[in-house]
Amino acid sequence: GLCTEDNIAMTPYSALASGRLSRKEGYTRRATEDDYARGKYDSTAEQDRSIIERVAELAERHLVSMTEISLAWLLTKVTSPVVGATKKAHVDGAVNAVNLQLSPEEIQFLEETYQPHVLTGIMAQNTPQTKDVKQVWMR
């Protein structure tokens, strides 16, 4: 890609898709309370389901958390992800991911069902047309 070709460092935020790549599907308090995350990810829930299932499968195979698998994959693509942590276990998962090596076959397994999403969140809302609109992060 462009970043690799031009030696541009990339540091993505929301590395775990607001927690969706850190646990199997199901009820969470955040899922019911975080309107912003739902707005970003609910429309792609069906297409993302197979990836989440594959992350869970590899986590079981490696005997690690889904967080570790997700971040280990991301670390093969970027300089450093921005990882939010509200609990010690979140930090532990991020640290452990640094030492987890996924095989090329495992990386392919995670990527083969991916379908690109339309731009969403802050980047999609940060346009000249919406510069004066009150956004969720301005509350």
PLM feature segments, named:
Residues 1-33, 65:
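Aromatic-lined glycan-binding groove of carbohydrate-active enzymes
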Residues 5, 29-57, 61, 76, ...:
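Terminal-tail/helix-coil boundary detector
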Residues 8, 79-80:
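A structural micro-motif
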Residues 22-26, 81, 94-95:
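Short secondary-structure transition/capping segments
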Residues 65-66, 86, 102-105:
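Alpha-helix N-cap and coil->helix boundary residues
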Residues 69:
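Glycine/threonine-rich phosphate-binding loop and adjacent beta-strand/alpha-helix elements that clamp
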Residues 72-73:
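Hydrophobic, secondary-structure "cap" segments at the distal end of domains
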Residues 80-90:
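Glycine-rich phosphate-binding active-site loops on the catalytic face of alpha/beta enzymes
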